């Protein structure tokens, strides 16, 4: 993801927002629960929906970089 967000979020992210999102992605959870998502959104000044979209897109980017299937549970023998 670009450092300033993207069109899917409908908002340009600041460096501080990206830093908070990335730290949570790498140190807390790649799949935050509803409460954690709400707290991250509040810290970033984003809506819960925008934050959830960011995590979905960031997960897709991470999975692609790791050579993993596009979706969870889609590993094939």
Swiss-Prot record:
SMART domains xref list: HOX (SM00389)
Residues of the DNA-binding region: 7-65
Gene Ontology CC: cytoplasm; nucleus
Gene Ontology annotations of biological process type: cell differentiation; heart development; regulation of transcription by RNA polymerase II
CDD domains documented for this protein: homeodomain
Location (main, coarse): nucleus
Coiled coil regions in record: none
Purpose: Atypical homeodomain protein which does not bind DNA and is required to modulate cardiac growth and development. May act via an interaction with SRF, leading to modulate the expression of SRF-dependent cardiac-specific genes and cardiac development. May act as a co-chaperone for HSPA1A and HSPA1B chaperone proteins and assist in chaperone-mediated protein refolding.
PANTHER family: HOMEODOMAIN-ONLY PROTEIN
Name by which UniProt lists this protein: Homeodomain-only protein
Organism: Danio rerio (Zebrafish)
Source lineage: Eukaryota, Metazoa, Chordata, Craniata, Vertebrata
